[in-house]
Each structure stands twice: as C-alpha cells, then as structure tokens.
C-alpha cells in the first residue's frame, strides 16, 4: 500500500496543484462563493480517489509482490489488468530463459564430470597393467617406477574427487561412523606411502567415538592431509601423530607432524585454491588443490578444519566434528 | 585343480592374470569372444569367474545375470569403477565379490581362494594349507612353523610373515619396503630398526635348524636368500 501511494505521489500532487489553481482562478475571477469552489474541489478529489481505488484494485497483486520478501523464484498471479498480465508474461519469459541457461550449464557440468570419470577409469586399466608387471620386482629401478605409478594414482584420485565435488549434493550419505576405524582404513590405504617416505603413523584415540559424516569424503580429506604431512616430514622426522580428543559435544582429530612446517606468511592462504606457497616451490609436486579440497569438503560436511604450524617444528591440522546431529 | 575363467577385455591384464594364476596351480580359461561369454562358461564349467564390468558388446552385469541362470559358481567382478553404486550393482546382479583396479595379485588370489573355500567347502580348504619351500626349508604358513628335515621351530606371526615373503622370492632380491608392507597391520608395523632385529632373529632360527639357507643383505636394495651347498 505504501509503495502504491509512493508511486502515485506525483499524480496526487498534480491533482492538488490543479485543485488549488482552479480554486484561485475562480476566486480571482470574482467567484467568491465557497460552496461552489469546494464543490469543484470535492468533485476533483472524488475523481482522483476513484481512479486510485480502481488502480489499486487492479494492480494490488503487483504491489504486494513487489513489497514482499523474495522467497524462491515463483511469481504469484499478478492480476488481470493489461499492465499486470504483461508484466507477468515478461517475468515468466525471463525465468524460463534463466532456467534454460541453468539447465544447459548443469548438463555441461554433468557431461564434464562423466567425461572426467570415464577418462580416469580409462587410465586405470594401463596403470593396473603396469602394477601387475612390476609387482613382483624389487630392484631399485622398479621401486622407482612403483613410486611414480603411486604418484599418478594419487593424482587421479584427487582429480576424481575434485570433479565429483561439484555434484556433491547428489553424492553423499551422512551416517554414524567410528572415527578410529576410519583412521585405520586411511592408514591401511596409505601404508606404501608411509613406508616409501619412512614416516610412521601413530594413533592416539580416547575412546571409540562415533561421528556423523560421510565416510568416503572424509577419508579422502584426511588422506590428503596425511599425505601432505608425510611428504613434508620425510627425511626430517619419522613420526606422524593422529590424535583424537573428545569434548562433550565435539570430537577433534589432530594430524600432527614434525616436519618442515609452513612459513607464517603462507599459513593464512593454504586453503586457497592453487596456492602453493614457499613449500610448494621448494618441494615441487604441489598443485595447491589438496588442502583447498579438504576445506571445501569439510565445509560441505559441516565439520571445521584449521591449521597451525611453526616453521621448522611441524604442522598440525585439526578437524572438528559435531558428535551429535 | 580349480579352473578359473577370466573375462577381461584388456589383453595385457588377461595375460598377466593367466600367467600368475597358472603359476599358483590354477587352470585358466579366457573368453576372447565377448558376444559368447556364456557359451564358454557352459562349455568349460569353471569354478570361479573373474568378470570385468566394461566389456565390448554386453557389460559384465549382463553376463553375470546370464551365468546366474545356469550356475551358482562364484563370480568376482574386477573393474576400474570405484563408485559405491557400481559395487552395489555388481553384487545385486549376482556377483560374489568385487575387486577394484588397480589391484594386486595378492588380493586376486586371496579372493579366489576365499570364494573357492566358501563355495566348495572342506575339499578345497584341506588342500589349501600353504607351505612355502626353499632349498628343503619348509614354512607352514598357517601354523607359523619352520621345518628342515626333522627339526622344527616355532616362529612368531611377524617372523613367519617375513620368512614367507623371503622364501617365496628366494634368490630374487626382496626390498625392505616389500617386507615392511607385507607385515604392516593397521597401526602395528615394523620400522627400519625393528626389521633389522627380526632379520637377525630369523637368521638365528635358520642357523639353529642347520638349514642350508642364509639371508644375505644386498646393499641399498634389500635381502635375498642364498642356498649353501
């Protein structure tokens, strides 16, 4: 209603001016009868009121819609007047176009993810062949090849997960998961990595705590942090701690290493995509995508992750989980 | 002798699996015509089927359903697909187990054994006590028992596992990494120093048995067995 009055303020003002003009015109023309003058003024105001009432009746849908908060993309029926139905049509058209664009983009994204998945699977077969061929061989050359193959496998996995992340909403399942079992399976799947770099994990778990999460995604995220920790500990320290602390309503997992640490100017940006920092330059093999994925995944899973480090002494990454739903 | 049928469109993987399984005493059959997998199955009557999902013509799920109409033999899927859905589909279409690529020989062998044990029972299980032998030295893997001629020696679980790997590989160099990996069990594992200790202990046990085998260190590479004449 306010909006309606405001948008017709000029009209009302105009009518009032006109009224005053007519009033004074007749007054100075010699018509000094108040009853006549007020009659003319009254008729004019009545006509104005009639017009406004008519407009309000016809267009009230639009004004209600405009002044209400926007919830969703639906447009209510606006009214039957020419103005209203035209506006309605136009809006619908616009929404249709937007939807179409959105669908096209989504379809493209889908196709991209499918392509990526297929591509990864295609590469996995020759990788399996290489693996099978060199599995029984232990000479240094083959150890080297094994190491490189492992690197490719890690890369593929990261690729797979980062492309799936865009469709996360369709690909996750929150359930009660035992954190210690999850950690054990992480350790199991990275054991070759630990051996290669001679860094040994140690688990300190308070009790067997259940957390609510998606096991697959969380495993991947922890795996990323663990591989980082191992990579930056190699040759400096052979310890990697996986500590679990339990609070009343939170469970905290700390992945603590005694490696090279992260320079203080880099620590704020380690979760940024493609940010590699000084360690990235010093150690190569860094894409700057791993920790970014970790952050994205933990956000989506409703966990938090933070990182602290002192250069030369080590790094600790802390995941925090709600223990209750 | 158990017969394994391999249905896999990558020729390399097929060949490697075939070699490996034959080395471990299995008979193998491969299906090379992917439009007639069922015919091969019915003709050869294998004990276990290894089945890829992505195949030309029909996919693995289809063949699994076809085979299931005639037989209940164990079917193990092997596929590069890593999604949960694919594994669920595999089991729901009648598969018994699922191996994800890239895989290791050990996994394939272990899963085949377990399927045979489950499907054909005692008969196969009895055959299955694993004995590893090198230069007359025998290791009874399941009992952690080392034998040479009439002498016996008990080993710990870790020692037995280490020696199993060493005996199997014999003169081939075995890297420290491999030994560590084979003995790794969740968060209980052998690091470099402990590995040295274990090797020393194994050498002592072999000496006590008067076994004509010695564990030689190969500098920078690992260990190898040498038979003394």
Curated annotation (Swiss-Prot), chain A:
This is Sensor histidine kinase YxdK. It is found in: Cell membrane. GO terms for molecular function: ATP binding; protein histidine kinase activity. The chain crosses the membrane at residues 9-29, 34-54. The keyword Kinase applies. Residues 118-325 form the Histidine kinase domain. InterPro entries: 2-comp_sensor_kinase (IPR050351), HATPase_C_sf (IPR036890), His_kinase_dom (IPR005467), Sig_transdc_His_kin-like_C (IPR004358). It catalyses: ATP + protein L-histidine = ADP + protein N-phospho-L-histidine. It comes from Bacillus subtilis (strain 168). SMART domains: HATPase_c. Keywords: ATP-binding, Cell membrane, Kinase, Membrane, Nucleotide-binding, Phosphoprotein, Transferase, Transmembrane, Transmembrane helix, Two-component regulatory system. The gene is yxdK.
UniProtKB/Swiss-Prot annotation, chain B:
Residues 3-116 form the Response regulatory domain. Transmembrane segments: none annotated. It is found in: Cytoplasm. Pfam families: Response_reg, Trans_reg_C. The keyword Cytoplasm applies. GO terms for cellular component: cytosol; protein-DNA complex. The modification 4-aspartylphosphate is found at residue 52. Phosphorylated by YxdK. CDD domains: REC_OmpR_NsrR-like, trans_reg_C. Residues 129-227 bind DNA. One of its GO terms (biological process) is regulation of DNA-templated transcription. SUPFAM superfamilies: C-terminal effector domain of the bipartite response regulators, CheY-like. Keywords: Activator, Cytoplasm, DNA-binding, Phosphoprotein, Transcription, Transcription regulation, Two-component regulatory system. Its main location: cytoplasm. GO terms for molecular function: phosphorelay response regulator activity; transcription cis-regulatory region binding. PANTHER family: REGULATOR OF RPOS, TRANSCRIPTIONAL REGULATORY PROTEIN YXDJ. Probable member of the two-component regulatory system YxdK/YxdJ. Positively regulates the expression of the yxdLMyxeA operon by direct interaction with its promoter region. Could also indirectly regulate the expression of the dlt operon. This is Transcriptional regulatory protein YxdJ. It comes from Bacillus subtilis (strain 168).
């Amino acid at each position: 209603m306010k909006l309606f009055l405001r948008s017709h303020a000029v009209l009302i003002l105009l009518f009032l001016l006109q009224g005053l003009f007519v009033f004074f015109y007749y007054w100075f023309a010699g018509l000094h009868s108040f009853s006549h003058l007020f009659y003319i003024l009254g008729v004019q105001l009545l006509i104005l009121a009639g017009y406004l009432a008519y407009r309000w009746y016809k267009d009230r849908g639009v004004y209600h819609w405009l002044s209400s908060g926007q919830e969703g993309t639906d447009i209510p029926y606006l009214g039957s007047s020419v103005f209203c139905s035209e506006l309605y049509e136009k809006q619908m058209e616009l929404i249709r176009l937007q939807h179409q664009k959105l669908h096209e983009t989504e379809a493209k994204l889908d196709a991209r993810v499918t392509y990526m998945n297929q591509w990864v699977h295609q590469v996995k077969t020759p990788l399996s062949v290489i693996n099978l061929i060199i599995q029984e061989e232990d000479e240094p050359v083959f150890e080297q090849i094994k190491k490189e193959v492992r690197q490719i496998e890690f890369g593929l996995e990261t690729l797979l997960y980062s492309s799936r992340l865009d469709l996360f909403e369709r690909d996750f399942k929150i359930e009660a998961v035992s954190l210690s079992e999850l950690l054990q399976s992480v350790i199991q799947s990275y054991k070759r990595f630990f051996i290669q770099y001679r860094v040994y994990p140690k688990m300190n778990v308070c009790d067997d705590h259940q957390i609510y999460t998606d096991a697959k995604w969380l495993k991947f995220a922890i795996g990323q942090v663990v591989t980082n920790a191992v990579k930056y500990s190699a040759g400096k320290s052979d310890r990697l701690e996986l500590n679990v602390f339990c609070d009343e309503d939170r469970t905290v997992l700390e992945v603590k290493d005694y490696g090279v640490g992260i320079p203080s100017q880099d620590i704020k940006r380690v979760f940024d995509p493609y940010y590699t920092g000084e360690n990235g330059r010093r150690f190569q093999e860094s894409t700057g995508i791993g920790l970014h994925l970790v952050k994205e995944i933990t956000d989506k899973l409703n966990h938090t992750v933070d990182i602290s480090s002192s250069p030369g002494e080590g790094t600790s990454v802390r995941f925090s989980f709600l223990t209750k739903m | 002798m158990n017969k394994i049928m391999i249905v896999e469109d990558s020729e390399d993987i097929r060949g490697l699996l075939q070699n490996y399984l034959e080395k471990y005493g299995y008979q193998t059959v491969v299906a090379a015509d992917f439009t007639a997998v069922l015919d091969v199955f019915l003709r050869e009557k294998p004990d276990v089927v290894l089945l890829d999902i992505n195949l030309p013509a029909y996919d693995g799920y289809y063949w699994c359903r076809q085979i299931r109409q005639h037989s209940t033999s164990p079917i193990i899927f092997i596929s590069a697909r890593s999604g949960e859905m694919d594994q669920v589909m595999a089991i729901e279409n009648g598969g018994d187990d699922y191996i994800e690529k890239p895989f290791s020989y050990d996994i394939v062998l272990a899963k085949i054994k377990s399927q045979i044990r489950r499907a054909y029972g005692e008969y196969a299980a009895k055959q299955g006590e694993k004995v590893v032998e090198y230069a007359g030295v025998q290791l009874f893997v399941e009992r952690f028992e080392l034998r040479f001629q009439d002498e016996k020696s008990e080993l710990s679980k870790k020692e037995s596992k280490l020696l199993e790997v060493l005996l199997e590989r014999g003169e081939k160099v075995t890297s420290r990494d491999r030994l560590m990996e084979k003995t790794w069990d969740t968060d209980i594992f052998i690091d470099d120093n402990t590995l040295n200790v274990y090797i020393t202990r194994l050498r002592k046990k072999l000496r006590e048995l008067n076994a004509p085998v010695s564990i030689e260190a190969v500098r920078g590479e690992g260990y190898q067995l040498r038979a003394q004449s």
